[in-house]
């Protein structure tokens, strides 16, 4: 008789304790289920998203994990807790290093804190997790952002030029290498001239490489 049924009352304390107990015992799926019950009632609770996110990552649900990390971080930022949001995204970068949005959002928050150098480091750190041909587009985007923050950082520009060449954007790679050559010196210039020659093995490129070898 349906009219006799009663919905189970929302017992927040019971659910929290049950989820914590399940997590402690390694019962991740049970903990996730309990946290989801809580989130069904409190969808914007940053602390609940922070608790469930690593469990989702550990159970190979990266998209759901990132959604929770992002939601929690955004909520903290809206409340003025930018430093806590940075800490949360740092945790996300450990669990989800191959989620490019993690690095982009983390860099955004470092810029919000006026920490340009840290934002640049974050983008380069993220780039290192995208090494394969399949990931090349993510690496290129991160490097373009890093280049905007440090236009004359040699490693950023040199790496970007190499990836552009591999991606088939040889014209852009050549232009970037020529730009680097205009302000770099010595050993770095030799590397630039060598890469220019590899891209365009012309007499002019060969002469530029030779001159860098002799004069550098």
Segments predicted by a language model, with ranges:
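Repeat-based scaffolding regions
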Residues: 1-216
